[in-house]
Regions:
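Export/targeting segments at the very N-terminus of extracytoplasmic proteins
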Residues: 1-2, 13-83
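Core subunits and conserved enzymes of cellular information-processing
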Residues: 7-9
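Second-shell loop/turn segments in exported
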Residues: 40-46, 57-62, 101-102, 134-145
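N-terminal cationic-hydrophobic initiation segments that often serve targeting/anchoring roles
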Residues: 60-63, 97, 153-156
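Catalytic and binding regions of secreted/periplasmic enzymes and modules that target cell-wall glycans
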Residues: 71, 86-87, 94, 108-181
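Short basic/hydrophobic patches in alpha-helices and adjacent helix-turn junctions
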Residues: 74, 101-104, 154
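Conserved alpha-helical segments that form or flank metal/cofactor-binding pockets of metalloenzymes
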Residues: 80-102
Length: 181
């Protein structure tokens, strides 16, 4: 039996530094075949502002609990309009193309869940969860829908919905706080 070394692909891990494992060539081919079918189904998504019909399947595939999907969808719609390439302060057209910057005050907010730079940028936070746990230490990987959902899941498992709840952000955000949610 011939051994093949595989690691995470750039599509799945972006900048992650994954350890390599020795497996059989047959297993490597089967894994790649499965990855190719997953990748092609997600690459076929045409993202449109306001449309998250694709989100359930992708979120479940990366590990989100089914009972959290309705709230996740509401947060994705509020934060990015369902546009995975969106950065904080950007204005997008109906096809999720960034057409201008309305403000430059929060450009570290990234992707579907508008994950803030304190979660990935060690120059802002030496305990940056995503950098330490997933080797996501820059904004670019978070502009991929699947990666953003995986990162958001880690944040949610660590902090619950707090990072996306304006009721927990302090008095200056009280106007954005919806009681009972």
């Amino acid at each position: 039996m011939m051994a093949t070394q595989i690691g995470f692909s750039a599509v799945n891990a972006m900048e992650a530094k994954a350890p390599l494992a020795s497996i059989s060539q047959e297993s490597a081919i089967a894994i790649q075949r499965n990855k190719n079918s997953e990748i092609s189904s997600f690459q076929a998504i045409k993202f449109s502002h306001g449309d998250v019909s694709w989100l359930d399947e992708m979120a479940l595939s990366v590990g989100w609990p089914a009972k959290q999907i309705p709230r996740l969808k509401n947060i994705v719609l509020r934060e990015s309009g369902g546009c995975p390439n969106r950065i904080g302060g950007s204005v997008v057209d109906s096809d999720c193309n960034i057409i201008k910057m309305a403000t430059m005050s929060h450009t570290s907010d990234s992707g579907l869940l508008q994950i803030n730079g304190v979660n990935y940028d060690k120059s802002r936070n030496k305990w940056a969860l995503l950098c330490n746990e997933m080797s996501i230490c820059s904004q670019k990987p978070l502009l991929d829908a699947e990666t953003n959902l995986r990162a958001g899941l880690l944040i949610w498992k660590t902090s619950g919905w707090g990072p996306w709840d304006p009721c927990q952000w302090g008095p200056e955000y009280a106007h954005r706080c919806e009681k009972g949610k």
